[in-house]
Amino acid sequence: MADWTEKYRPSTLSEVRGNDKARDAFADWARSWDDHHEAVVLHGSPGVGKTSAAHALANDMGWETVELNASDQRTADVIERFAGRAARNATLGGSAAGGGAAGGDTASRQLVILDEADNIHGNYDRGGASAITELVKESGQPIVLIANDYYDMARGLRNATQEIEFRDVSARSIVPVLRDICRKEGIEFESDALERIAERNRGDLRGAINDLQAATEGRDSIAVEDVVTGDRDKALGLFPYLDAVLKEESAEEALQSAYAVDETPDDLTKWIENNVLDVYDPSEVVRAYDFLANADVWLGRVRATQNYSYWRYATDNAAAGVAAARDGTKGGWTRYGRPQFWSPSDATADEVVGQIAAKSGCSVATARREVLPFLEAVTHHCKPRELTVAMAAAYDLDEAGIAFVTGSGESTNKVASIAEDAQALREERMEDHAEGAFAGGRHAADDLGASDGETTNASGTASSSGDDGDADGTTDGDGSDANDGNDDDDDGQAGLSDFV
């Protein structure tokens, strides 16, 4: 089944909903481009229609498009080879760049679209930001940069471009889009159901369309009760989740099951990819892999940009999409296998993340998404050494775990010595903990011993002294435990202060 966000993508700017001022400013930029030759930045939250507007504008102007998105590597060399060639040289139609506003040259231009311009960084995109800045200054073709956060872009790039903000799409603008899709698909609807979908997506038009498609899969109507408004309270196991997606549940139900599993979307996608062949018929597999390919694109964007809001689109495809590819429910028992391409480093990552989650009192997903990247950053290549030792001791990491977190070689003397020192630190802390636990008993015994030569009065003064010592020891131990419990209360920050 076709992805509705693509099937109903606006073909002209007049069809772009919810951002009339931005749409008009964008059209003005295009019509006057020959006068200013400036690139433009379309910025705003994911799913508000920035990329769709760029393609719609190209249709309106009769321009061809060249697109480089966040799942592509965007080094200086790549940008020059793809976008630079299109921007500086002849168009595919054979016309020279830089023609006048009148005549056929304008219609034969190419619109260069660079997605996620605010997330070009690191070795993966080495030199990309400076190459784009140079490109927009010298371009002979119109360039559109797409960004979520305008101020995450380099200042030089901001200064060299115009900017147009696309705001979150209001629920009252989303509902008509959903209504039009229902009518074109022959789906009867309750207005309250569409309003609930629109409100739940909080300005994300793309997400609302995905939710509508999931909720109506295999149906010819949608009512309020068909729209699930919240996540399930009870965590779902991995194998029940696979049953839900591959055998039992509707697209909407499978999507909610995905939200209830304590795993990240990239791991869930790997499990689905590895097991779908064992459950689906050939025709179903073909449809399922179309959705899995879309999920991989979104996961690529997450890896390239570290923008985890894109995870929801990967989940939409890997869960709801794959479930929608199935013809009815399936019975029987299936031996689900771990992904065959799960490398030793993946296994190490699972073990490390599991230990972090257990020690910190947070979920596996939080440990993988928030705590692990922090640890990797502050202990890169085992520096500073003292902090790395403390981290390894806090999370009970062996040499393989230390090497994985720090990005160092497992067989190096550096990692081995850190593992030894971490073990020594753990033992030292265990001794200190044991001494604290028995300190009260020792104090009580000392006090009782000291009172042997004294006359105990009727009120039991000596015994009271012993009781005071016992109470003091207990208070110290309980205070430590209470602090540990407080660290675990905040799932998002659990574990980060354990050793810093």
UniProtKB/Swiss-Prot annotation:
Compositionally biased spans, kind Acidic residues: 467-492
Bilayer-crossing regions: none
Tree of life domain: Archaea
Segments for region (Disordered): 443-500
Residues holding ATP: G44, S45, P46, G47, V48, G49, K50, T51
Keywords of this entry: ATP-binding, DNA replication, Nucleotide-binding
GO biological process: DNA replication
Classification via InterPro entries: AAA+_ATPase (IPR003593), ATPase_AAA_core (IPR003959), P-loop_NTPase (IPR027417), Rep_factor-C_lsu (IPR023935), RFC_lid (IPR047854)
Compositionally biased residues, Low complexity: 455-466
Cross-referenced SMART domains: AAA
Any GO molecular function: ATP hydrolysis activity
Entries under NCBIfam families matching the protein: PRK04195.1-4 (NF003228), PRK04195.1-5 (NF003229)
Subunit structure: Heteromultimer composed of small subunits (RfcS) and large subunits (RfcL).
Record PANTHER family: CHROMOSOME TRANSMISSION FIDELITY FACTOR 18, REPLICATION FACTOR C SUBUNIT 1
Function, in words: Part of the RFC clamp loader complex which loads the PCNA sliding clamp onto DNA.
Family: Belongs to the activator 1 small subunits family. RfcL subfamily.
Listed HAMAP family: RfcL
Protein name per Swiss-Prot or TrEMBL: Replication factor C large subunit
Provenance organism: Halorubrum lacusprofundi (strain ATCC 49239 / DSM 5036 / JCM 8891 / ACAM 34)
